Amino acid sequence: LNMDVLCAFENTTDYKVLREYINATQGYLSEINVPLSQDIDNQDYYELRSNLFARLAYDVLKSHFKKEFGAVIRKFILNVSLYNIYQYHVFRRSAFDGKLFSDLFGDDAYDLYERIFQFDGGAYTLQQRALYKSHRRDFKGAFEDIDKAISINGSNFSIKNSHAIILFEANKDKRTPISEESIAEAMDTLRKCFSSDKRKVYHAQKFAEFAIYLAKNWKDSSYLEEAKKWLAQLIDTQESNSSFTKYL
């Protein structure tokens, strides 16, 4: 958090008012021993020191305060220039998450992505908008966006992974020769991502998730052993000890 973001979010330059917001927030967090500290090198920046709290807060807000959480995100996007966000090049990689926007806003996030696109029309924005459209079953729009993202940054494994996800989701509910070819292409893309990317966990998890779906719904168990082998490898090498990996 920095003062420029707070000024824009609250639409005020009154330092006294902003200071009251910060003090109140620090007071709430101190009650649960979670510090919101000023940056040593720049006193206008504040950092939440607990990643665990941030993850738990995210889950609670999404599950129990969806309306309020959505209102804050919408206000942030409409009021705050992305140019004011500290380390935006890092922020954008996971910001504006397509699944989160689908869960919070339903079909009403298209305008938010248009707003974001005014500032950043890059591959990561296109990737998340494509995933959002996929969650809304707008597969035509999803493919248009993910293909554009690939044309911008075709070597990015995360974007390739997203293309595989969209391709799978668009074809999993129908059993035709074309859909079978598309499913095979999606699984092969994930296989290549797992083989070539140093960050293997998400590729393996998605491959396993899709393998289970195909076994249950298509009676096609041909991918299960491969998925099991990958997950065992990740657990054995301690690349992933997550409960989701072990659950799969």
PLM region spans:
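Short, intrinsically disordered, charge-balanced linker/junction segments flanking boundaries
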Residues: 1, 244-247
